[in-house]
Amino acid sequence: MSRPLSDQEKRKQISVRGLAGVENVTELKKNFNRHLHFTLVKDRNVATPRDYYFALAHTVRDHLVGRWIRTQQHYYEKDPKRIYYLSLEFYMGRTLQNTMVNLALENACDEATYQLGLDMEELEEIEEDAGLGNGGLGRLAACFLDSMATLGLAAYGYGIRYEFGIFNQKISGGWQMEEADDWLRYGNPWEKARPEFTLPVHFYGHVEHTSQGAKWVDTQVVLAMPYDTPVPGYRNNVVNTMRLWSAKAPNDFNLKDFNVGGYIQAVLDRNLAENISRVLYPNDNFFEGKELRLKQEYFVVAATLQDIIRRFKSSKFGCRDPVRTNFDAFPDKVAIQLNDTHPSLAIPELMRILVDLERMDWDKAWDVTVRTCAYTNHTVLPEALERWPVHLLETLLPRHLQIIYEINQRFLNRVAAAFPGDVDRLRRMSLVEEGAVKRINMAHLCIAGSHAVNGVARIHSEILKKTIFKDFYELEPHKFQNKTNGITPRRWLVLCNPGLAEVIAERIGEDFISDLDQLRKLLSFVDDEAFIRDVAKVKQENKLKFAAYLEREYKVHINPNSLFDIQVKRIHEYKRQLLNCLHVITLYNRIKREPNKFFVPRTVMIGGKAAPGYHMAKMIIRLVTAIGDVVNHDPAVGDRLRVIFLENYRVSLAEKVIPAADLSEQISTAGTEASGTGNMKFMLNGALTIGTMDGANVEMAEEAGEENFFIFGMRVEDVDKLDQRGYNAQEYYDRIPELRQVIEQLSSGFFSPKQPDLFKDIVNMLMHHDRFKVFADYEDYIKCQEKVSALYKNPREWTRMVIRNIATSGKFSSDRTIAQYAREIWGVEPSRQRLPAPDEAI
């Protein structure tokens, strides 16, 4: 008789190895069936399409969790340096298809659903976008998570689990209307609540100075409960974690402040604490100094740092008891990347923990903090820079304000020592800005408290060093770096454009998916007639598919043989959707002037959301819809010109429109777009770019060759010269008849006959206070668009140029970006090694 098992041996039966899923069609069908009945408690008679989506999501998720647990076990064993990416936004989009792609489950799931009489694409369309971001900054964070997992980095994304993400945009009567994005209404199968890791976050209160140092007391406490989402790497069995915090009121919230009878009100008031994670602020590139937003910024930072320190102390020991007490090794085990200034309070918060709680002396704590933190800047627009009023910080975070003052004092002492007698430099570099309202400049705090500061495209990083951070660069040039943004080729090629990915793989194999530089091999096919034909065919299929989508969803008819001219991004004056509008009206006027002339047919599509309080951006949307109303109903125009506003632009819509684009509009005023990433997505998906020499466009043109790019307009130096001379819109208005005609049409109510003065604010801005100099680039833009049309008439030459663009887009993989962050900022080495699958021995 065998001896009884010891407790430890019994426990060993609880292992992920015994649960490893078999990834064949029969097993997937069985698991789908099990989840429909046992997880969702439905049978086929009452199951809705959403139930089928959830059953499939749970089936796919089963293949993630073994790898997820294994990955975290591996990190505990190896105790690598961990990377913490702190961001107020993660614009993830949908998860189902991305998970299937990265786990190599797509074909099997396709077949399984087909055998069950279900349509995979229909199920995928049911999933809500996780819209926890405004635009580029949040989407970048999502691409970075994908690349960090694919490169085997022990990385964690930390943010807020907003109950309501970016608003849904509805167009009504030509105007943008906002609707709440209740994305969690039906539940989220991809997240796992972790209530056992709930942490307290403190607000308000006051500081007491004791013999043991400063104490922050009488605070209000809000609890931060984490929800974890798995982030799979590409076919390497690595699954990292995105941890998002949700605000909860403590059980005794407000009860101690109430007299007898106040109980009900106290329970109702719990909402006030929980509002912290209620909604994403919908401002892109604009700072609005609201207390609730400051609470959100501190909330994510305070919870995250407690979590980081807990993991640092207990790491490699498989337990939650503190074991590491010495913080000397902290910067060797922890890297914190601040995605813009939104999580900048991590710097004073880490100082508070080290000095007040861990009793470290200031200089040592400051050394640890600086070596741990790094800061990414995303904008040079002055209205976007965070400058928090001192009175707000004093009330909400009194200890942090004291710490910021101390940081500032010591920092300015260093500046004074380096530049004796330069008083104005001290004023410019101070973290504290004097004025009617005293403010803290959060970018200055980030630079002082980080060992690395990076811009997100070469030209942007140069502008930082020469202009807004010039003084800081002169003090500490070694801190400043460039890390040109990138996009994940998994979502932005394999997932959204499988036809193109297949045509590429037939020629050069599949390795390009995790090594995008391999696309250069396509340069040898630029004269290959079969390849040219295949690339053109895929584009035409994508255009037909998107045209069918527009017809189905919006009842809009478009000509699939027209040039698809697309500008999709947040609506902002600096992105110059207005310049696009002026071109569209100019084209319309030319067609009307010579109705019998041949014009290359175009469908111009503009999409993007305007911040709810941004009047001019909302007027721009109204203008696009008004132009569409006139152009699309003019029989003289026919299908030679169509203007479409793409409603509710979001990640899942980008995945449909970008593969269908012929022309990508990247037309910001030179020196205003830090990088852009939409530009890269279009390039990778076989669109040609019309753009200014701004952001990453500069490097894209360099990679592809300027002759394969439609470049127009002022360079940064020209803009600077024009600023010195003084920009005068009237000069262009007087000199260019076609421009004058367009502006007269806008002024006279040609596009708004029922309300002739509807666009007076736009005209007034363009004529008298246009910071972004639309008229200065108008003429060159129109000429450049003529070159676009001329080339489009020659499909073979157009497609050859497309191939050259695709072949040179490898640099713009987020894998390259993240490998550079890893080596040059975080001090870790990326790895393409596979972890063992859950059913393999470690």
From Swiss-Prot:
It catalyses: [(1->4)-alpha-D-glucosyl](n) + phosphate = [(1->4)-alpha-D-glucosyl](n-1) + alpha-D-glucose 1-phosphate. GO terms for cellular component: cytoplasm; cytosol; extracellular exosome. Belongs to the glycogen phosphorylase family. The record marks Y156 as: May be involved in allosteric control. InterPro entries: Glycg_phsphrylas, Glyco_trans_35, Pyridoxal_P_attach_site. The modification N6-(pyridoxal phosphate)lysine is found at K681. Allosteric enzyme that catalyzes the rate-limiting step in glycogen catabolism, the phosphorolytic cleavage of glycogen to produce glucose-1-phosphate, and plays a central role in maintaining cellular and organismal glucose homeostasis. Its cofactor is pyridoxal 5'-phosphate. GO terms for molecular function: glycogen phosphorylase activity; nucleotide binding; pyridoxal phosphate binding. The modification Phosphotyrosine is found at Y204, Y227, Y473. It is an enzyme of class 2 (transferase). This is Glycogen phosphorylase, muscle form. The record marks C109, C143 as: Involved in the association of subunits. It is linked to Glycogen storage disease 5: A metabolic disorder resulting in myopathy characterized by exercise intolerance, cramps, muscle weakness and recurrent myoglobinuria. The modification N-acetylserine is found at S2.
